[in-house]
Amino acid sequence: MKIIIDTDPGQDDAITALLAIASPEIELLGVTTVAGNVPVSMTTRNALQMLDLAGRPDIPVYAGSNKPLLRAPITATHVHGASGFEGAVLPPPSRKENEGHAVDFIIDTLRNNEPGTITICTIGPLTNIALALNKAPEVIQRAKQIVMMAGAFSEVGNITPAAEFNIYVDPHAAQMVLSSGIPIVMMPLDITHQLHTSAKRIARMEALPNRVGPVVAAWLRMEKAYEAKKYGTDGGPLHDPNTVMWLLRPDIYSGRKVNVQIETQSELTMGMSVVDWWQVGLLPANVTFLRTVDDDEFYEVLIERLGRLP
């Protein structure tokens, strides 16, 4: 299956790309970057480094939006560190990003492939996708689906009491995408908070006989220490790799189709995912919203796939 990853790397963003590259079922056509965890100059540099780590400097990287549609930029350096890749030291990128804008790459790639053949995995704010919708709405409709790490229901928020980070950074973009009519699969905090990066699981990654395993372990030890302390768990949640894992193993997830809207008016609940799980509203379902995951099987697949890399 052909995919584009739209991302703001971030340690767990990089693990998402590594999982995709390690999986023969997936053809990663390109990586597009957006401001989120850190500014776009850093997310682009990190994307280049993660592809070098995987031994795939041939995969194109296009820099995208450096700010949300309407709001001031918000970062998560308190989680990911100043560079977004704290925890492991990687060599400088072997190349520069590709010429051109991420939005144009997304549009051109969808235009040049058969309709319904490309999945967009979004693991950062949805600014690039919203801009593509605004620029070429008829082209973006050619996407097979968008699989996004975004939102929350029972877990509510991780950046404010009401909002998940990727949505909160650019809630207006998120609402545009959710209103687009494109098939959407949402991996919310309800899923990711079941996937504890325990010391035992990290140790298994560190023991992989390649260069990727120890780097991933170092990333997770750094990034997830903050969240483990915050939530009082045996390891912080693992967020972004769920997008690619769902493509590989949808059988380990469960959920249902519901309506999801994003709050864009109230400062108190800005960016809240309003999930009609109990179908009490009148709006039609626009999202496949997932709520449970087999955490042990998730990590078995992830660790095995990471072990295939250099």
UniProtKB/Swiss-Prot annotation:
Name any GO cellular component annotation: nucleus
Q: Which CDD domains match?
A: nuc_hydro_IU_UC_XIUA
**Presence of the UniProt keyword Nucleus in the record:** yes
Give compartment(s). Answer: Cytoplasm; Nucleus
Any single GO BP term: pyrimidine nucleoside catabolic process
**Keywords (A to Z) from UniProt:** Cytoplasm, Glycosidase, Hydrolase, Nucleus
Q: Entry's InterPro entries?
A: Inosine/uridine_hydrolase_dom (IPR001910), IUNH (IPR023186), Ribo_hydro-like (IPR036452)
Give one GO term, molecular function aspect: uridine nucleosidase activity
Q: Does Hydrolase show up as a keyword for this record?
A: yes
Signal peptide range in chain numbering: none
Q: Which SUPFAM superfamilies match?
A: Nucleoside hydrolase
Kindly identify the residues recorded as the active site.
Answer: H239
Family membership noted in the UniProt record: Belongs to the IUNH family.
Query: What name has this protein been given in UniProt?
Result: Uncharacterized protein C1683.06c
